[in-house]
Regions:
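Alpha-helical cap/lid subdomain in secreted, periplasmic
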Residues: 1-124
Length: 124
């Protein structure tokens, strides 16, 4: 990002970390550092959130699910609560692995992002 003209970035990280059971505090700290770097460069951020599966228990899920709204509030950035809304766990919208979206799933993700992005583009 050092020598590039970037106006807006969609930040959505942490899903694979969640699937591996990474400590939510580590995920949050990593996202925080990324957000701070983008804000230092005056780059507008759309934080696209994820929601934890219950694989690692309720305590883990609660901690993970709080990451994205907390960071959005703290840094006053635009926030989409769940990037995969309508896509996650829908076999018709995912590849055989059940975790990654197929072409139709990507289309739904684009729809999920559209209103937030249009709103951000109008601000610039």
């Amino acid at each position: 990002i050092e020598n590039k003209k970037i106006d807006i970035v969609i930040l959505c990280l942490g899903a694979n970390d969640m699937l591996r059971g990474t400590n939510p505090n580590i995920i949050k700290q990593n996202l925080k550092q990324i957000i701070e770097r983008f804000q230092e460069k005056n780059i507008t951020i759309l934080l696209a959130g994820m929601i934890s599966l219950e694989t690692f228990g309720n305590k883990y899920k609660k901690s993970f699910d709080e990451i994205y709204p907390e960071l959005a509030r703290k840094f006053r950035i635009s926030y989409l609560p769940f990037l995969l809304d309508g896509v996650a766990l829908n076999p018709k919208l995912n590849l055989r692995d059940g975790k990654h979206p197929n072409a139709l799933g990507v289309r739904q993700i684009s729809i999920n992002l559209e209103k937030k992005l249009i709103s951000l583009l109008k601000k610039d």
